[in-house]
From Swiss-Prot:
Binding-site positions, ATP: G9, L10, S11, G12, A13, G14, K15, T16
Residues given in the record as GTP binding sites: D58, V59, R60, S61
Alphabetized UniProt keyword annotations: ATP-binding, GTP-binding, Nucleotide-binding
Classification via InterPro entries: P-loop_NTPase, RapZ-like, RapZ-like_N, RapZ_C
Protein name: Nucleotide-binding protein CTN_0898
Pfam families with a match to the protein in the record: PapZ_C, RapZ-like_N
Highest taxon, organism lineage: Bacteria
Naturally occurring in which organism (per UniProt): Thermotoga neapolitana (strain ATCC 49049 / DSM 4359 / NBRC 107923 / NS-E)
KW Lyase (keyword) present: no
Family: Belongs to the RapZ-like family.
Coiled-coil intervals: none
Amino acid sequence: MKRVVVVTGLSGAGKTTAMGFLEDLGYFCVDNVPGSILEELLKLFMSSDLEKMAIAVDVRSEHFSDPVEAIEKIKKKTNALIVFLEASKEELLRRYALTRRRHPLQRNDVGLEEAIEKERQILLPIKEMADFVIDTTKMTSHQLREILGQSLMNQSGGISVRILSFGFKHGIPMDADFIFDARFLPNPHYVPELSHKTGLDREVEEYFKKYSLVDEFVYKIFEVVNVAVKEYQRSGRRIVTVGIGCTGGRHRSVYIAHKIAEMLKKEGFSVVEKHRDLEKV
């Protein structure tokens, strides 16, 4: 079965990294295709021996007068997977300062910050039609490749659920569909013999088992996520990200994320369990 992936999103959010990864996976990669030859390109691909093609679409308007229309055309012709990459304004400003490259919408009368916000508004309709929205603000290139690979692996195999623990003091994951706050639960950080351990350690698990409130919270999260994921699956959604946060991201959120992941696996879902801030102080 032929597979088409469209990589789009904000300039500076990681499209080059994503396209390089897809090329490594054997995709025929096409960047900055003129809109006038897009339809012909799709016809050639569908009739060729190529199995996988990735197309990068952005706001370079001399090539795509309407990026939304271009992606709708690709989707209609190929049932493509749409990957939308974004990052916070502050992170994009930092990246442009490092590379000293010019934003595609930047002009003499349009500064970088204004160009970033203008692009965000132009691409909002594409973000809303995307299969995957990946926020790369706090990601390394390796992490982006890992998440993109997981997304592609589940393209034809039903829905994938990402269970992500994090610490609120390190920032909220902006790509999460659900955020659950575990900061009201008892905190093993204040137990001297447990403070250096994590929510994956047996001693911490035994600590949490003393509190019925913890079990109740875990079950309530599972109930909500289980119902939501099943409905998302029926609607054709391919990935759902569930964020569970505590203060530092080492004890409460890690324990709960691990428990929820185990419960969802028993329901037959494809689950990716990540602990973003486990090694942070």
